[in-house]
Amino acid sequence: MGYLVGVTALWAFSFSLIGVYLAGQVDSYFAVLVRVTLAMLVFLPFLRPSLLRGKQRLALMALGAIQLGIMYTFFYHSFLLLSVPEVLLFTIFTPVYIALLDDLMFKRFTPIYLVTAILAVLGAGVIRYDGIDSGFWLGFLVVQGANLCFAIGQVGYRRLAADLPPTLAWHNVFGWFFIGAMLVALPAFLLFGNSAALPSTTLQWGVLAWLGLVASGVGYFAWNQGATKVDAGTLAIMNNALVPAGLVVNLVIWNRDADVGKLLLGAAIMGAS
């Protein structure tokens, strides 16, 4: 639990740092590439390939590709379509995806999640009822893509950890996770990146360094370790604890002119889901 609480406090600043200093200024594919590269470099010196079998290494790489590589691609693009508070609020549905994946894994169906989806859309509409356009709904869907990838990564990591020895030194194998993410981030930048929109200030490079080395490197290792030490219910709660933490940071420091009333009303409807 302590891992999850600590990472929640750490990640509460990430949304605003991306939205304020990087979105629309630094190419999103490049930002993802730098972030993943720095995180990978944190763990490469500790990597011991002999600790995992081939299929286990591939599984950890696949989880990194989904939970980090693909998720970040969705996540960074969402800031081009939505405000920071909106991105934060729309991440509230990750626990729903975790539950749905759990249902799928155990061949169950829980109808209440259909009601949850309807309430989610209503809550989103309240937040932007006076300015809804195709870009807004696209942004909403992009965030859901990120949420789904993050959920798949967490569920998959828990399953993988359950099949590995409890004494495994995870810091000696976690580099595979970031290598998998790199296999998505590098081709994405080479194919779609804009080399004319690289960081132009020391502040932007500093933000990328912090996000890569600390928020991604330390953060994802600690979060995934924490996910293996709690039950699914606690993990779901902690997924949503990031929402109020990130909102407080954004509204207090960077976004004091936001329409707090609409945000609270929309959040209440989504919270009811």
Q: What are the functions of these language-model segments?
A:
Residues 1-7, 48-75, 138-146, 198-218, ...:
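Loop-to-transmembrane-helix transition segments
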Residues 10, 14-15, 44-86, 91, ...:
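Specific transmembrane alpha-helical segments of multi-pass solute transporters/efflux pumps
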Residues 13, 17-20, 38-54, 121-135, ...:
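Membrane-interface helix-cap regions at the ends of transmembrane helices
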Residues 19, 40-43, 98-99, 132-193:
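Transmembrane alpha-helical segments that form core, pore/gating elements
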Residues 21, 31, 78, 104-109, ...:
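Hydrophobic/aromatic residues within transmembrane alpha-helices
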Residues 30-40, 76-108, 114, 146, ...:
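Specific alpha-helical transmembrane segments that line the substrate/conduction pathway
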Residues 33, 87-93, 157-182, 213-252:
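Helix-helix packing/entry segments at the starts of transmembrane helices
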Residues 43, 93, 109-129, 240-241, ...:
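Hydrophobic transmembrane alpha-helices of multi-pass small-molecule transport proteins
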